[in-house]
Amino acid sequence: MKYSLCTISFRHQLISFTDIVQFAYENGFEGIELWGTHAQNLYMQERETTEREIDYLKDKNLEVTMISDYLDISLLADFQKTMEKCEQLVTLANWFNTNKIRTFAGQKGSEDFSEQERKEYVERIRMICDLFAPHNMYILLETHPNTLTDTLPSTLKLLEEVNHPYLKINLDFLHIWESGADPVDSFHRLKPWIQHYHFKNISSADYLHVFEPNNVYAAAGSRIGMVPLFEGIVNYDEIIREVRDTDHFASLEWFGHNAKDILKEEMKALTNRKLEVVSS
């Protein structure tokens, strides 16, 4: 397993992609998970500079692990526009040399779907996968509240319903724990589809609401309860023991303040634990 940082951690800071790449390299990250908004802006407005940074990434054996975006598959959406956005993401993914696109399976809880609604969402997800498949690109659905992948049973059912070789999972361990499932058991049951992990933690279940999108994306949103991996309620020592021998990236998804300081310390803690395993 390798570690990547998320550019979304720097969503409210004035920091260049150049600085992020250098920071990642200096602190032992092997990849960068690129927020879709950042990817689009770099391609449209800073193409020449970014091309140099992409070359720098290669030289330092770093990579863009995934583009994390949001594809609207709601029945009220203009699905043609969603498919056009998928075409744009193919261009971006090729440019950044990645073959993974993260999105969400809708915007409401799995229990709130009628049988017919679910069928229509399944068909839309399959169509999106069909668009990316000729480019050898994978769609990764994130395990997340208020989506069709908000519980382990619904996630497994959705994978079976869509039944597409280019549909995969980004396993967010905090959110699968939030659903009431055991994170390690979830890993084993979803393992055939997993292509990426999200690592983050919280001090108490009382503060899980701080990860709701409207709060996360607000510059003045609450960050109470957001804590480093090994200081929270989810047991990451146990999780890492299970997943460390896999070939996937784990992104440290830090949404709180002082992103550079926290990410630097997280990598030190992860490195120390790795050294302890090797020496024991």
Feature map (PLM): residue ranges:
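Catalytic-core regions built around general acid/base machinery
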Residues: 48-60, 124-131, 186, 238-242
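The substrate-binding groove and active-site-proximal loops of carbohydrate-active enzymes
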Residues: 71-79, 227-230
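N-terminal-biased segments
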Residues: 5-18, 35-50, 81-86
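Active-site-proximal loop/turn and secondary-structure-junction residues that shape catalytic pockets
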Residues: 9-11, 36-38, 70-73, 105-109, ...
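Conserved beta-strand positions in the central sheet of alpha/beta enzyme cores
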Residues: 33, 66, 102, 140, ...
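Glycine-rich, proline-tolerant flexible connector loops at the mouths of alpha/beta enzymes
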Residues: 33-58, 106-112
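Histidine-acidic metal/acid-base catalytic patches
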Residues: 1-4, 9, 14-28, 58-61, ...
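Active-site acidic/histidine proton-transfer and metal-coordination neighborhood
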Residues: 19, 56-59, 75-169, 261
